[in-house]
């Protein structure tokens, strides 16, 4: 049955939002915990991820219908659970709006910019479309994750990148696309918007617990004045959910001695699962949370509840990846301990060679300082405030400090593996930015020794937020280097370049004489999605199907024979990548059995044609 758009779209939107909030709301009821928008969203997100894991392990079809049934069962179970006494209510989840007092117009201006970017620039991260979003589309298309992480040649034609990022964010996007019946990126904006709103709620709640409403107000304003934090959420990758989950863990641990302490620890465990769903290193947050619970000398039953919830589902995905690939961190070479996709590892190392040299010179450290001062000044203030609080042995900051240090360590380890460079790597620090905003909001309260000091602090925060608004609008661009007339579209400048280029490339590739099999070899992550309607199969450079091309142990004649049998001829290379040099130095086709010619070269793409000699001779 087809409903009119005016009815159909709102109903689909309501279903989407209901799946993101209702299961979590009912779970809070069953746990006898007060309702919170952030907690409801975190629980629902974790439940969706766990549902996808269960479906994957059991072979159940991943579809919007089955996901809705599973979420409905969770919601129903929470609703019928016996209720023994009402939990003490929390302040409104929208206190970050209602409690802003004179700052409310400025805070609303911040959210106006956020909503504008969510509507006009959804999923603006440079690789979201062919990783997180595309994985969501593919899991719905095939009804499973059997192809992920990709291992065989056929797997790599379904998902190009050789990685094993947990499908937490992809599960959320699959829910959005399934509810919408559309792959339009705009349908993911409610998810991203809820991440940021929930993050601000938890920043408010944590700072309020530490230092009252004034500290909460300052902390949220400082978070809004940190463009890098907002950008880390808006790009639609994993860093928004990581920040939300980590702040949620800290909040729950600090509530563990309250009434229903075990329920708070169960909620902390669910936050750990949400954190583990974001990235390969995610399970470390569960381990550190359990250690914190033990160091804080929380009751053994409380720590047991945390571990019972957090550990199994945090480790479920890496365990599956390990079973399938022999390496729990499939895209990483962990000291040669685990097997890897050798071609992808060598290719990515050449891609990351500049990032691997980060911090090798004073200029790198100066660039880091400049980036943080320009785009995350409240976090820099937060570092000073945190040091002050730690030296004063303020106990509220202990757990937050541990997770800030952990986040910085994870970021430092990730820089060498970030193709986007130092600035792009700073999105990984999103949990630290959020917690440092709390530390700054609380720490500033210690200098409130006069009315003049209070006024100066208020003026400084106002100035920070006003100055940050243009940056929030245009990041990753610099508003000081752009004409005002370009600000509105600057945040998606890469998209404005990539989309027309992708359309042009699609037309070029479609015109190539590809033969009956219609296959090309490429390193371009966006091509499988861009060419999905053209019936052209993309074989990635690192697919096991073409591993022979880089095998020095094979004889040239055998390599040529296999190339001809592969029905591949054209190679499409992104000039922004190191693939051209990589092929020159690694591909074993510089022999008399191959003829390699350049078919076309543009500003962004190189197209080669490799033909095996028709006279291959006998197989050797």
Show the residue positions of the predicted features.
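Membrane-embedded, hydrophobic transmembrane alpha-helices
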Residues: 1-94, 559-560
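Transmembrane alpha-helix segments characteristic
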Residues: 111, 217-225, 270-272, 288, ...
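Signature aromatic-anchored transmembrane alpha helix within multi-pass, membrane-resident enzymes
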Residues: 101-107, 213-219, 263-272, 286-290, ...
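Transmembrane alpha-helical segments
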Residues: 111-115, 226, 279-283, 443, ...
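Short periplasmic/luminal acceptor-recognition loop of GT-C membrane glycosyltransferases, typified by
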Residues: 496-543, 569-576
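Membrane-interface helix-loop-helix junctions at transmembrane boundaries of multi-pass membrane enzymes
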Residues: 93-101, 208-216, 259-263, 296-306, ...
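Membrane-lumen/periplasm interface segments of specific transmembrane helices
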Residues: 121, 295, 302-381, 471
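Hydrophobic, aromatic-rich transmembrane alpha-helices
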Residues: 22, 196-207, 294, 311, ...
